[in-house]
């Protein structure tokens, strides 16, 4: 796809590069410490999309040599049972990273579960201690999707200092931490959201425009300044008239791609980078916990 569109930010290719590097790192670390890094993934219920994401993460772990500890629990699992399991994983010396696959069934308190994870094993970078470290520009495990966006921009030498960056979306998963990372890179950052007045006018100011809402086709050509860098974090499954489904982002790719200076595709953009950063966080946690970093 990158050959067809020369202005693509190819997250899939960069993720493959990162995983090749991580494979070598893991081999060296296993030789030095006597075990590989380990990632525990907790999934509750039978959400098909979540199951697919978990399989993808487990497959990626296997490819780079990270030990994967899967915990697929029934929908009726209680909060107390999950907290007990997380505490056990916090104490397990084989486990360097813990991830709770979201969303969870409605009877579970996701925030309390995320808070229960040892911050040094917070592979998703969502514990308040790690988010606080981000705000203070201190070392810590970073949220995977925002960190993946930043790594991709860095790969393509996208200048951020002094640039206008607009993030559409204010979630704790993407929008807020990504805005902080852009600010740390000396961009001038605006966060837009569902209550923003005249979203199109705000978006058109952006040198770097990031859509992270989960609304197919939200960003149209009329919202993009010529030459802007457009990063599409949205992953939405839409059903076509034929009955077949396909993945699309929050950006109308066909309309925006000819205008943009750079643009990420969906799929093949930020999704693979999120998984690569999850692996990277797990390896970083392993190194820190073994006094190697």
Swiss-Prot record:
Matching CDD domains: NAD_bind_m-THF_DH_Cyclohyd
Protein residues bound to NADP(+): 169-171, 194, 235
GO function terms (MF aspect): methenyltetrahydrofolate cyclohydrolase activity; methylenetetrahydrofolate dehydrogenase (NADP+) activity
TM spans (from-to): none
GO BP term, pick one: methionine biosynthetic process
InterPro entries the record matches: Aminoacid_DH-like_N_sf, NAD(P)-bd_dom_sf, THF_DH/CycHdrlase, THF_DH/CycHdrlase_cat_dom, THF_DH/CycHdrlase_CS, THF_DH/CycHdrlase_NAD-bd_dom
Pfam families, alphabetized: THF_DHG_CYH, THF_DHG_CYH_C
Pathway: One-carbon metabolism; tetrahydrofolate interconversion
Keywords: Amino-acid biosynthesis, Histidine biosynthesis, Hydrolase, Methionine biosynthesis, Multifunctional enzyme, NADP, One-carbon metabolism, Oxidoreductase, Purine biosynthesis
GO cellular component, one term: cytosol
Reaction(s) catalysed by this chain's protein: (6R)-5,10-methylene-5,6,7,8-tetrahydrofolate + NADP(+) = (6R)-5,10-methenyltetrahydrofolate + NADPH; (6R)-5,10-methenyltetrahydrofolate + H2O = (6R)-10-formyltetrahydrofolate + H(+)
EC number: 1.5.1.5, 3.5.4.9
Alphabetical list of HAMAP family matching this protein: THF_DHG_CYH (MF_01576)
Role according to the record: Catalyzes the oxidation of 5,10-methylenetetrahydrofolate to 5,10-methenyltetrahydrofolate and then the hydrolysis of 5,10-methenyltetrahydrofolate to 10-formyltetrahydrofolate.
Family from the record: Belongs to the tetrahydrofolate dehydrogenase/cyclohydrolase family.
SUBUNIT field: Homodimer.
Entry protein name: Bifunctional protein FolD
Organism: Cyanothece sp. (strain PCC 7425 / ATCC 29141)
Gene label: folD
